[in-house]
Regions:
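Alpha-helical membrane-interface segments at transmembrane helix boundaries
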Residues: 3, 23-27, 47, 51-54, ...
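Hydrophobic alpha-helical transmembrane segments of membrane transport and translocation systems
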Residues: 258-343
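Juxtamembrane membrane-interface segments in integral membrane proteins
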Residues: 46-54, 61-62, 74-148, 159-169
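Transmembrane helix boundary and interhelical junction motifs in multipass membrane proteins
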Residues: 30, 34, 50, 205, ...
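Anchoring transmembrane alpha helix of integral membrane proteins
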Residues: 1-80, 152, 316-343
Length: 343
């Protein structure tokens, strides 16, 4: 018996390692497909409501247009915000040159020659490599968008078909489990996006208010950037903290003010992103804050930025599936924020 248990655990570990390796190396396909499934779950209520009043294909077109419009608005806001910042930087290059001269002089006085470091680090091969890296990432982004869009369209078209196929299964328990599990996953995905959007709006408003009070120029742009980037856990808030900090350094020329702004922005991001949001999301989704953070880090490791965004929805789906079966119900209970109702 003991030997059988060891073999069973060993096989489970081997299967887990193989699965994780497969997910890692299939990122180019699995990440956009997973994102598409998540988007279908979010957009389906609109599609379902529309196709009760208009033809299915027309409802699909409207749903796709609305989904793309939301994504386009978010992208536009980021481009608009950083565009204002970039224009401000161009108009204030003299300040940047002055800061660079001061920093170089200070480093030289402490025995660090920044000029020699830059000269030694310069390598045309590095520039070529950087250009190739940018090109590769751009190709990856385009590929991600194309694959995700294709599966979003197909997914929205086949939701009703998939439901009818499940309803024709002979096993009543399996049929009930699949339908109820899918409904719960979709419902939790929608709750997650409500929480995410609420926290992003709160972050944007607080950052905007802080920038106004602190006298930071382009306060609206920084608030908008913080709002949009907050949809990408940890990576987005990091960017929304570092860029305003460097901007303040150029604006004021004071390292003390720069440090103070950096500390304040980190406090804002920590309180909202690491304290309020995990607890609110955990309460809404019956997940512990620890699991919320672990999901983001784990899937970021596997799939990068895409994993950071969809890591928590994946964990939501896994735990919801575990709820539906007696053999795995204990896993969902152990990782929950509190007491769960029996499925």
């Amino acid at each position: 018996m003991k030997h059988d248990g060891v073999v069973r655990i060993s096989l489970l570990l081997i299967a887990s390692i193989i699965t994780l390796a497969a997910l890692y190396y299939s990122q180019a396909i699995m990440a956009p497909v997973t994102f598409a499934l998540f988007t279908v779950a979010i957009a389906w209520p609109l599609q379902s409501a529309l196709q009760k009043r208009i033809p299915v294909l027309l409802a699909l077109v409207v749903t796709i247009v609305v989904t793309l419009a939301v994504l386009a608005i978010l992208i536009f806001l980021v481009v608009w915000g950083f565009g204002l910042v970039f224009q401000w930087v161009i108009n204030n290059t003299d300040r940047i040159q002055t800061l660079y001269a001061q920093a170089t002089e200070w480093l030289d006085s402490h025995g660090v020659s920044i000029t020699n470091l830059v000269a030694d680090s310069y390598n045309p091969g590095w520039i070529i490599g950087a250009i190739r890296e940018v090109g590769g990432r751009s190709y990856g982004l385009v590929s991600f968008i194309v694959i995700a869009f294709a599966f979003i369209v197909l997914g929205l078209l086949e939701v009703d078909i998939a439901r009818r196929n499940v309803e024709q299964l002979n096993s009543q328990s399996l049929r009930r489990s699949l339908l109820r599990g899918a409904e719960k996953i979709a419902d939790k995905f929608q709750k997650y996006m409500v929480v995410r959007t609420t926290m992003s709006l709160l972050t944007g408003v607080v950052v905007w208010s802080f920038a106004l009070v602190a006298g930071i120029e382009l306060a609206t742009a920084w608030g908008v950037i913080a709002f949009v980037l907050n949809y990408i856990p940890f990576i987005g808030p990091f960017i929304a903290t570092v860029f305003p900090t460097l901007f303040v350094l150029v604006q004021t020329g004071s390292w003390q003010v720069c440090f103070a702004v950096f500390v304040c922005l980190n406090i804002i991001q920590f309180v909202i992103g690491s304290y309020l949001e995990p607890r609110i999301a955990g309460a809404a989704l019956s997940m512990s804050p620890f699991v919320v953070l672990l999901a983001v880090f784990f899937w970021s490791f596997l799939w990068g930025i895409a994993g950071a965004f969809i890591g928590l929805p994946i964990m939501i789906a896994i735990l919801t599936i575990c709820e539906q079966h007696k053999s795995t119900e204990a896993i969902a209970l152990l990782l929950s924020a509190g007491e769960r109702k029996s499925a």
